[in-house]
Swiss-Prot record:
Belongs to the ketol-acid reductoisomerase family. Residues 1-180 form the KARI N-terminal Rossmann domain. It comes from Bacillus cereus (strain ZK / E33L). One of its GO terms (molecular function) is NADP binding. This is Ketol-acid reductoisomerase (NADP(+)) 2.
C-alpha cells in the first residue's frame, strides 16, 4: 500500500495557480477554507442561492461555475454525484483548457462514464475520508484526516504531484494519503454504503426493533437496545477495532456476540453481499440511480417517505427529547 505524507508533497506546486472549488456544501466549504489557510488562491463556483451567499460571507470570490473554470488551473468538483454530469456538460466541458486539472472527491461519474474529460486535461481524485466539518476542524487543530488519491488521466505528466499538493493544502498528508484507483474507490465506497454502513445497518436496526415490539416489548425499550446503544458500540470499534469493542463490553455480551452473530449474518447474507458487489461492479446500481434521477426520483421519494414513517422514527424522536446532550439540527443537512 503506497501512502504519502507531508514530506512527499509540495503545496508550492499550487503557487501561482488558482483552484476553483465547484460546490460549497460540506466538503466544499472545508476544502476551500483549508486551501486558503495553506496559502492557495481559491475561488468558488456555485449558482446563486444559499451556498453562494455562504461562500461570499466566508470571504471567497464567488462566481458562476463556467467563470470559475475559466479562471482556474485546478478545478475540484464537489457537487452531489447526481448533479455533476449535468453541470459538467452545461458549464465546465467547453471551458476546459489544455493542462488544467479536473479533481474529484468521489469517482462515481468518471468510473461510470457520466463525465468524459478531454485527453488534454489531468483527471485525479483527492478524497478525504471524513465529513467536511471534521476535515475543517481537525485542520484547524493542526492535524489532518486521511485521504485517498488516484490519477485517472495524466496529460501533463505531473498529475500525481499536483493532486498530492492539493491533498497537502487540505491537510490530509498530515495523516496520510493512500494511493488507489477510481474503480477501487468508487466500487468499495458504494458497497460499504449499501451493504454495511447505510443499507445493512438500517435494515438490521429495524429488524431488531420490529422483532422486539412484535414480541410484546415496549417500543421505547426496543429503541434503546437496537438503535440508541449502537453508537456506544460503534465508537469502541472506531477507536480500536473489534478487539477493543469486545474488551470493553461485558463478558455476557461478548459471548453472545460470538455464538449469535453468525446466525444473523449468515452465509446466505454474505452471498447476497457478493451479488450486491457484482451489481455495483457491472454498473447496474449506477444505471438504476441515474435513471431514477432522470425520472424525478419516484421510487427514492416513496421509499424515503415510508422509512420516515416507521415506528422506530416516531419513538426515537420522543426519546431524544429526554437527552439534553443531543443537539438535533433544526434542518437535516447532507454531510
Amino acid at each position: 500500500m503506497k501512502t504519502y505524507y507531508e514530506k512527499d508533497a509540495n503545496v508550492d506546486l499550487l503557487q501561482g495557480k488558482t483552484v476553483a472549488v465547484v460546490g460549497y456544501g460540506s466538503q466544499g466549504h472545508a476544502q476551500a477554507q483549508n486551501l486558503r489557510d495553506s496559502g492557495v488562491e481559491v475561488v468558488v463556483g456555485v449558482r446563486p442561492g444559499k451556498s453562494y451567499e455562504v461562500a461570499k460571507a466566508d470571504g471567497f470570490e464567488v462566481m458562476s461555475v463556467s467563470e470559475a473554470v475559466r479562471t482556474a488551473q485546478v478545478v475540484q468538483m464537489l457537487l452531489p454525484d447526481e448533479q455533476q454530469a449535468h453541470v459538467y456538460k452545461a458549464e465546465i466541458e467547453e471551458n476546459l483548457r489544455e493542462g488544467q486539472m479536473l479533481l474529484f472527491s468521489h469517482g462515481f461519474n468518471i468510473h461510470f462514464g457520466q463525465i468524459n474529460p478531454p485527453s488534454y486535461v489531468d483527471v485525479a481524485m483527492v478524497a478525504p475520508k471524513s465529513p467536511g466539518h471534521l476535515v475543517r476542524r481537525v485542520f484547524q487543530e493542526g492535524n489532518g484526516v486521511p485521504a485517498l488519491v488516484a490519477v485517472h488521466q495524466d496529460a501533463t505528466g505531473t498529475a500525481l504531484h499536483v493532486a498530492l499538493a492539493y491533498a497537502k493544502g487540505v491537510g490530509c498528508t498530515r495523516a496520510g494519503v493512500i494511493e488507489t484507483t477510481f474503480q477501487e474507490e468508487t466500487e468499495t465506497d458504494l458497497f460499504g454504503e449499501q451493504a454495511v454502513l447505510c443499507g445493512g445497518v438500517t435494515a438490521l436496526v429495524k429488524a431488531g426493533f420490529e422483532t422486539l415490539t412484535e414480541g410484546g416489548y415496549r417500543p421505547e425499550i426496543a429503541y434503546f437496545e437496537c438503535l440508541h446503544e449502537l453508537k456506544l458500540i460503534v465508537d469502541l470499534m472506531y477507536e480500536g477495532g473489534l478487539t477493543n469493542m469486545r474488551h470493553s463490553i461485558s463478558d455476557t455480551a461478548e459471548f453472545g456476540d460470538y455464538v449469535t452473530g453468525s446466525r444473523i449474518v449468515t452465509d446466505g447474507t454474505k452471498k447476497e453481499m457478493k451479488r450486491v458487489l457484482t451489481e455495483i461492479q457491472q454498473g447496474e446500481f449506477a444505471k438504476k440511480w441515474i435513471l431514477e434521477n432522470q425520472a424525478g426520483r419516484p421510487t427514492h421519494n416513496a421509499m424515503k417517505k415510508a422509512e420516515q414513517n416507521h415506528g422506530l422514527e416516531k419513538v426515537g424522536a420522543e426519546l431524544r427529547e429526554m437527552m439534553s446532550w443531543i443537539h438535533a439540527p433544526k434542518e437535516l443537512v447532507k454531510k
